[in-house]
Amino acid sequence: MPRRRVIGQRKILPDPKFGSELLAKFVNILMVDGKKSTAESIAYSALETLAQRSGKSELEAFEVALENVRPTVEVKSRRVGGSTYQVPVEVRPVRRNALAMRWIVEAARKRGDKSMALRLANELSDAADNKGTAVKKREDVHRMAEANKAFAHYRW
């Protein structure tokens, strides 16, 4: 623990096309080897495809997909007297977004479609329809938290 003041989280610049900080964060998570312009072009073309499929604006469709993947509870390991318990804890709003975006990108990378933009568009549209690998991941996390509800009193 730091003995001096706690440094706050840095603000990131909103993305140039839509002016959204959430989308800028998503592009940063999508980025590989510091190639931001490549990540931006992949994200924008995926959002364009998603908007055409859903009939909503790009940001609206992205927000819906993200909302369906955001976890509300997760489990954290807590060691008590020689045994480790999986303790369910509520997820902070910033971490909710980070986890949802990370899961969507991971699921898109595992898909077998041709281009990354298409994989990402398919994963986002699946997430918007409440199906797909990223939504399944959220369901698994919620199921783990539900199964370990008995250890909720070990929260710290």
Curated annotation (Swiss-Prot):
Keyword Lyase: no
CDD domains per record: uS7_Bacteria
Domain of life: Bacteria
One BP term from GO: translation
GO cellular component terms attached to this protein's record: small ribosomal subunit
Transmembrane segments: none
Subunit structure: Part of the 30S ribosomal subunit. Contacts proteins S9 and S11.
Gene3D superfamilies linked: Ribosomal protein S7 domain
The keyword Glycoprotein is assigned to this record: no
Name of the protein this chain belongs to: Small ribosomal subunit protein uS7
Functional description taken from the UniProt entry: One of the primary rRNA binding proteins, it binds directly to 16S rRNA where it nucleates assembly of the head domain of the 30S subunit. Is located at the subunit interface close to the decoding center, probably blocks exit of the E-site tRNA.
Native source organism of the sequence: Salmonella choleraesuis (strain SC-B67)
UniProt-recorded Gene Ontology molecular function terms: rRNA binding; structural constituent of ribosome; tRNA binding
Keywords from the named record: Ribonucleoprotein, Ribosomal protein, RNA-binding, rRNA-binding, tRNA-binding
